[in-house]
Amino acid sequence: MKRFLLLLILGGLFLGGFRPFAFSQGSMSIYMGQLSDQSEISLVTFAPGEELHAAFGHAVIWVRDPLQNIDKAYSYGTFDFKTENFYWKFLKGTLPYSISFNSMNDLVYYYSQIEHRSIKAQTLHLDPAQKNIIYQALEQNLLPENKNYRYQFFHDNCSTRLRDIIEKAVPNAFQWTKYKNLSGLSYRDWMNHYLATNSWVTLGMNLALGIPSNQKATASESCYLPDNLSEALEMAEVKGQKFADSPLLIYQAPEAEKAGFDGLGPIVVLQLLIALVMFCSIQFRNNPRFLFRMDVLLFGVWGLLAWFIFFLATGTDHQVMSWNPASLMLFPLNFPLVFWFARASKKVIWTHYLSVVCVLFLIGLVWSTLLFWPMALAGLPWGIRLFALRLKAS
């Protein structure tokens, strides 16, 4: 249950869709020789799945050499639940991630028969030297002293590592400035393309992300998503010739049923809560005891949420969570001050406090709305009471 709750809150952001385990630990079987002329190297892309951990897809580099009896699919983004202090390191952004490899048959079976996700492969057109550059880089990363790295959702994940390895072997393969369809959107925009708008996970992930996620991603940077890397590879050319074969469909997953509108999603629930708060504010305007209890609940819960977001922004190594305007909208200081509200309602300092918080709330609300509009709904329930208290204090 603890694992489920942690993944529900933060899993989409930290895991993306990137594989959280290895089917086998083959890192001891490292072959540092040269590939033969019959070897082939492919990028294999696994489509997004229905589960949270699979929301953004996955990608591996597949190296096969029948003469050397090599069949390895290299995957970045592997981690071990048995790591000491796993949950704390996971939350702090200090959990070590690593590279692993499996046979392609194992991967195809798992992703097709267990997770029911489509699979496509693109064979790269490489000369022998380029093949060995890629292969040696992967094998070097498997060494114990090299295999672990610090994962970053947007900048260092299973897809960006493969992009960098390919670029190192063939520097001019990608003409990034020509890929207009892969540029112009922010990291957050690309992420939200893969998520349902009316979803608690989507809302939570957007609340957790800070200003860095709104930076416009270049075509190269957009390849933090495996689908975008596959698309870039399809457009890549070397000396006027296609750098990779067109995607070969290895497995076509059955078309999933389109999910209907979720009546318990955040858009509906938060709108109902906003309406309820407005109704109670009017209906019980002459019942200070009831309103005080409602304020304690709203300001306390929203204040705790604000402290959690503030911790993610300032107390972790997740750079994409820094400078988060949601902290202004939800305002952490509400939690320690919540029990003071009613008793200070006649004091001048109370009026000044409410005025300052109202301004900060509006700044955070407008800012958050521009980033992802459902976030505004998350701030309004307590915001309505904030302005009601400010009017009462006038």
Where are the regions that the model predicts?
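A structural motif
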Residues: L126-E139
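A eukaryotic "domain-start" boundary segment
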Residues: Q25-I30, S36-S39
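Positively charged n-region of N-terminal signal peptides that target proteins for export
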Residues: M1-F4, S394
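Second-shell loop/turn segments in exported
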Residues: G49-E50, R117-H125, P144-F153
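Glycine-rich catalytic cores of cysteine/serine-nucleophile enzymes that process amide/ester linkages
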Residues: D37-H116
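Bacterial N-terminal signal peptides
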Residues: L7-G17
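Activation targets extended, charge/polar-rich intrinsically disordered C-terminal tails
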Residues: Q140-F339, S345-I349, V357-S394
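Boundary at the C-terminal end of the N-terminal hydrophobic targeting segment
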Residues: F18, A22-G26
